Amino acid sequence: KQMDQIDIKADPKVNTKKLDLVLEGTRFNIVSNKVVMVVPKGHNPKGISDFRDAVTEKVFLIALGNSDVPVGQYSEEIYKNLGLWDKLKSMNKISYASNVKEVLSQVAAGAVDCGIVYSTDAATSKGVDVVAEAPKGSHKPITYPAAILKKAKNPEAATSFVDFLKGPESSKIFNKIGFAVPTK
């Protein structure tokens, strides 16, 4: 019943603060995520190693999320900030996917040369290898905030759970599945 006690949102546009639902001073970022480029596991004959490779002869097809899903929005933002979005689109190299799992499936099956996904998804996929992280500053940070709800039926338990989320045990688990944990 933690969800009746705390609020955790991946989408920063969902601002429960304005709805006056969270206890003041309890909001914090649990973890952050990265955007990475992946290739089929054990198969990278063209030596793809950089996001910029997408507009070179190294890449025939790249899987990206549709523009209506977060991973697609981050991919577009990255390529726009690299000054390569228009060029990439004009080269007809993009295989669009409806979600990050579909991007992973296309890459793992070898249907595309590479794809753009979250590090957490890459870390839990057996079918891909990470070859690059998105260049620093090429997209807005991906953070997952949490806060204790004002109407928590058991605020002490909620506080204990939040303390657990901030602790070293949780940090190990989060790191193992590809999340970055904010430093204190």
Question: Language model features by range: what are they?
Answer:
Residues 1-184:
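Exported/periplasmic ABC-transporter solute-binding proteins
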